[in-house]
């Protein structure tokens, strides 16, 4: 009876060691198939077979030792390219097709990345996508800034693109220098319109305040300047300006932009 038990225990011990060796080998094999790339400061972990999917490309050359590539301080391959755009390059290698998020507007930059990594298929798909976008008529975005604060009607900002209105709101909170925890509802009319009604005159110029407690938000000139600069940064161009001969664009009674 004791002999049978001892024999069984030895069999279990052998099986345990055997399984342990298998797990170790599998772990080593798994690690050997993975590769970490540092692309412009962004780390990407992927399988070698993904990077070698297309022969005679930059990434395939690195994996197979055809191309010498420097290492970063942690021993990862370092590629001095756009780290954010590389995710689209990697997704192309994984999926075999170009899949981009809605509203993607960096086709030319992505085309340059495709050329660098020698991915002809990706370059062709980016080019095709860009050509289709050029043929598709774009909806005109309209922005109007009207200043009637002298007539107690305040400053009104209208834009048919709600995302621009959201950017203006965020900017106003920022320039208020911590006076606001968030954008006040009293200024919001809709997703397309902001109406700043409450201004008081002071030695430093006309000041935008909150209705409830007269908390100072920013000056009228700052408000208009930030809206104008935001418009220009977002690609709007000035169409008309009604300024009553006051000179600076900031003092205009009405500004109309299109994009």
Curated annotation (Swiss-Prot):
Residues 1-25 are annotated as: Disordered. One of its GO terms (biological process) is protein homooligomerization. One of its GO terms (molecular function) is identical protein binding. Pfam families: BTB_2, KCTD4_C. Residues 33-134 form the BTB domain. This is BTB/POZ domain-containing protein KCTD4. The gene is KCTD4.
């Amino acid at each position: 009876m004791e002999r049978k038990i001892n024999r069984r225990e030895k069999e279990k011990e052998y099986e345990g060691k055997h399984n342990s060796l298998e797990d170790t080998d599998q772990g080593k094999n798994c690690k050997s198939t993975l590769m970490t790339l540092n692309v412009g400061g962004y780390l990407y972990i992927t399988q070698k077979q993904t990077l070698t999917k297309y022969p005679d490309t930059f990434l395939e050359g690195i994996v197979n030792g055809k191309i010498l590539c420097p290492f970063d301080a942690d021993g990862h391959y370092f590629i001095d390219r756009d780290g954010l755009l590389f995710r689209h390059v990697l997704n192309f290698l994984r999926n075999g097709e170009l899949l981009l998020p809605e509203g993607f507007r960096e086709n030319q930059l992505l085309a340059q990345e495709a050329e660098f990594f020698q991915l002809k298929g990706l370059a062709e798909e980016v080019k095709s996508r860009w050509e289709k976008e050029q043929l598709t008529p774009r909806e005109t975005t309209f922005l109007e800034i009207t200043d009637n604060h002298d007539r107690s009607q305040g400053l009104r900002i209208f834009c048919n693109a709600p995302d621009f209105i959201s950017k203006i709101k965020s900017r106003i909170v920022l320039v208020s220098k911590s006076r606001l925890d968030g954008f006040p509802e009293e200024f919001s009319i809709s997703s397309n319109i902001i109406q700043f009604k409450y201004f008081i005159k002071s030695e430093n110029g006309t000041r935008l305040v909150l209705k409830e407690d007269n908390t100072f938000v920013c000056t009228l000139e700052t408000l208009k300047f930030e809206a104008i600069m935001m418009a220009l940064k977002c690609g709007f161009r000035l169409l008309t300006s009604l300024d009553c001969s006051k000179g600076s664009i900031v003092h205009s009674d009405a500004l109309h932009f299109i994009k």
